[in-house]
Amino acid sequence: MRLEVSRHCPARPTLRGRVFRACAAVAGGSLLVIALSGTSGARVFGPPGAAGPPHYVSLGDSYTAAPLVPNQTGSPAGCLRSTHSYPFLVAAGTGAATFTDVSCQGATTANMTHPQSVPLGTNPPQDNALSAATTLVTLQVSGNNIGFSDIIIHCTTLSLTNPFGSPCKDHYTSGGTDKLRAKINAAAPKVAADLQGIHADAPNAQVFLVGYPVILPNSGNGCWPLVPIAFGDVPYLRGVEKALNSMLAVVAAANHATFVDTYTASIGHDVCRAPGTKWVEGLIPTSLAAPFHPNQLGEQGMARRVLTALG
């Protein structure tokens, strides 16, 4: 999918009456003003490096694609991309000259260089979207390398057996080895290889590796049964997510990419918060988003972090 992003964009209503507005600010639209409700005001962003608006390519998994967040777009439809995902907001906020979003739900590091089968089609290798003309790349990947969906299924199911214990932690650390930490370690060289491939395919691009926002509360033992993760498993899974983000930060620094920390800004917006505050939905979403995935507020929050990183 290749989209040309207009430099003159009207206000667009979002969930719960919030408004995203992007419109050309100065000559030729080379700078753009973006105002997101809930921020301190409009911010001005220039192009990320080379003169003129960026040629932007978005790579990633479901946290990038924003499944079920309105409006779903693109091909193959099974990738579940939203027009309100953070890449779309970043494209508007930078006044991107061209914008290509090839993110896809379920993507792993392997799908940067290998096709991905999804319902209703196949997503080509995501790196195919890159070229020497590309000047901005965002990548968000590795959650599926550690088995994000399986973790959710196991941990929510096991919470019913011992809601005040740590059945999920016990499952993943049985035998004396933390299987999730091992998967994080195994993913590190694969993320590094993806970044190296991006630099090879898009030698003129600034590359940003985007981390994952808070899912479970940053302190305490969660909110079972509202979100069915056992009390003792919340600190464990919180540590797993922090370890994943730490790995991404280290790999980014070692491979000429800028790490975008979305975790810190999302503290206080976890799945246990009320609708209108939480950035990530729980097992039973209260707004249009996939379970345990960012809603529209979460995508806006991640967009702000990426735009801030662009400087």
Where do the protein language model's features map onto the residues?
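Structural recognition of the beta-strand scaffold that forms the well-ordered cores
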Residues: 55-60, 64-66, 98-103, 135-140, ...
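Catalytic His-Asp segment of secreted/periplasmic serine-dependent ester chemistry enzymes
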Residues: 213-311
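Short amphipathic alpha-helices and their capping/turn segments at secondary-structure boundaries
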Residues: 41-55, 121-138, 191-206, 307
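Secretory targeting and sorting signals
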Residues: 1-44
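Oxyanion-hole/transition-state-stabilizing segment in secreted/luminal serine hydrolases
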Residues: 67, 120-183, 214
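Conserved N-terminal glycine/acidic-rich loop preference
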Residues: 136-137, 162-201, 208-251, 255-259
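Serine-esterase "nucleophile elbow" of acetyl-processing enzymes
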Residues: 44-106, 128, 156-162
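Charged, often glycine-rich, active-site loop that binds/positions anionic groups
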Residues: 106-124, 271-286
